[in-house]
Amino acid sequence: MPMKPLDGETTSTEKLSPVLRPTVLIFDSGVGGLSVYNEIRTLLPDLHYLYAFDNVAFPYGEKSEAFIVERVLDIVTAVTGLYPLALVVIACNSASTVTLPALRARFAFPVVGVVPAIKPAARLTRNGIVGLLATRGTVKRPYTHELVARFAGECKTEMLGSGELVDIAEAKLHGQPVAIEEVRRILQPWLRMAEPPDTVVLGCTHFPLISEELQQVLPQGTRLIDSGAAIARRTVWLLENESPEVLSADDNMALCLEITEQTVQLIPVLQRYGFKTLKKLAL
């Protein structure tokens, strides 16, 4: 795809040079990765961002590991055919738990994954009970249990897997109201506890999008923790130390696997996040 320079302001004698920036790809199966993108953009507002989401295979939570690995490799490979990438963020917990080794083996650029914020939650809990709210797939994976054993061994960790909350977050971004009673029903296993978790790890990037609704339902004072800020800091460090040589002057762009009526409804939302266009990515 040819690179189109951004129009600069003109002087009386010449047009200013376009701003050249490293290209960073943020990938998720759905729109949850926008929560991570927002954190990165806060620290690095002037990068060239691509946001790719797999609206054909969404959600990934119940997909097999082999499927997710092959799918994500294919998508990132397709994006590299459009732009030389400085860095990729896999802003999807389900994908991060299984794809990072394969991605790092294939590509030379840094690949950053999402890790549930178990370690900071274990430090912050006051009653020694940490909740992990994630997809059912993430809750079941050995990687997640290893994290808990390594960083929260002295805490009691209550895991709750839900695919419905992912759908609720997606629907919210599409402009649909959130049914608080449905959120309450999903969280009942914790709400019925005599002493529920006082610190909850949002182990899916969709869940920060509904943090207000979660706070309405969970006991007052419950802390919600996600990995977005840590990923943003890691991205800053990598770009400062990698010094990418290939730069772009293009506008930020969103990519999906299929243009549907539902994805068209997302265009105003994506524009509010700074993405000028939405295009179909061919695999």
UniProtKB/Swiss-Prot annotation:
InterPro entries from the UniProt entry: Asp/Glu/hydantoin_racemase, Asp/Glu_race, Asp/Glu_racemase_AS_1, Asp/Glu_racemase_AS_2, Glu_race
Top-level lineage group: Bacteria
Protein name: Glutamate racemase
Top enzyme class: isomerase
GO molecular function, one term: glutamate racemase activity
PROSITE patterns linked: ASP_GLU_RACEMASE_1 (PS00923), ASP_GLU_RACEMASE_2 (PS00924)
Active site as annotated: C92, C204
Stated family: Belongs to the aspartate/glutamate racemases family.
Primary role: Provides the (R)-glutamate required for cell wall biosynthesis.
Binding of substrate, residues: D28, S29, Y60, G61, N93, S94, T205, H206
Cross-referenced Pfam families: Asp_Glu_race
Keyword Kinase appears in the UniProt entry: no
Enzyme Commission identifier(s): 5.1.1.3
Catalyses which reaction(s): L-glutamate = D-glutamate
BP GO terms, sorted: cell wall organization; peptidoglycan biosynthetic process; regulation of cell shape
Keywords in alphabetical order: Cell shape, Cell wall biogenesis/degradation, Isomerase, Peptidoglycan synthesis
Naturally occurring in which organism (per UniProt): Erwinia tasmaniensis (strain DSM 17950 / CFBP 7177 / CIP 109463 / NCPPB 4357 / Et1/99)
Pathway: Cell wall biogenesis; peptidoglycan biosynthesis
